[in-house]
Amino acid sequence: MKYFLEHNGKKYSDKDLIDAFYQLGIKRGDILCVHTELFNFGIPLLSRNEFLQTILDCFFEVIGKEGTLIMPTFTYSFCKNEVYDKINSKTKMGALNEYFRKQTGVKRTNDPIFSFAIKGAKEELFLKDTTSCFGENCVYEVLTKENGKYMTFGGQGHTLTHYAEEQFNVFYRYHKIFSGILIDENNISYNKTISYYVRKLDISSEPNLINIINIVNNTKNFKKNNFAG
C-alpha cells in the first residue's frame, strides 16, 4: 500500500483509489476513456512522476491486461495552423494525460485536433483513420459500439457532447475543413485533411452543463463516487 495523496489532513493510498474504481463498477477487461482534472483531488505526497505513475497503475490494476485505457491528448494543432507531431505535440489536457501518452506501448490516434492516447487489448479498434473529428471511426463512436465506459476523473467537463452534436446534426454547428501536416510515429510527414463540426459564432449555443449533468445523472448507467477532494 502506498500513500500518494492528502486532502484535509487525510491521506489516501493506491488501495483507496482502486477500491473507489471497483465501487464505480470498473472491472477487468473494461474499455475505459478518462478525462482528468487532478488538481481537484488534493496535495500529492510523491514526486511528480511517481504520483502520476501510481494513478496509472491503479487504472491498470483494475482493468487488467484484458482492458483498454484511453485518455484525450487534444492539441488543436490544425486549428492553430501548427504541425501535428504524434510523438512530440504536447497535449493541453493535463499532466496525467501527457505522462500517459509518453509511456511505452501507448499509441496515439491520427486526429490533429482531438487525438487520444490508447493502450490495451483492444487498442487497434480505436486507431482507424477518420475524416471527421467526431464522425465515423472516431474514438467516441468505437467506445459506444464496444460498450466502453467514460470517466470524468476529478471534474465534470468532457467532449462526449460534441460527438452527440455531430450525430444529431444540430443546427448551431457546421462542418469546417482543416488541413495541415501530420508527422507520424515513424517521423514520416504527410498532408492530412479533417472536418471539425464547429460552433456557429452568430448563434448562442453554449452548452448548459447543469442540464447535461442532470440528464446523465438520471440514467441507469451513471455512477458517482467521491474521492479525496
Which stretches of residues belong to each language-model region?
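N-terminal and secondary-structure boundary signal
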Residues: M1-G229
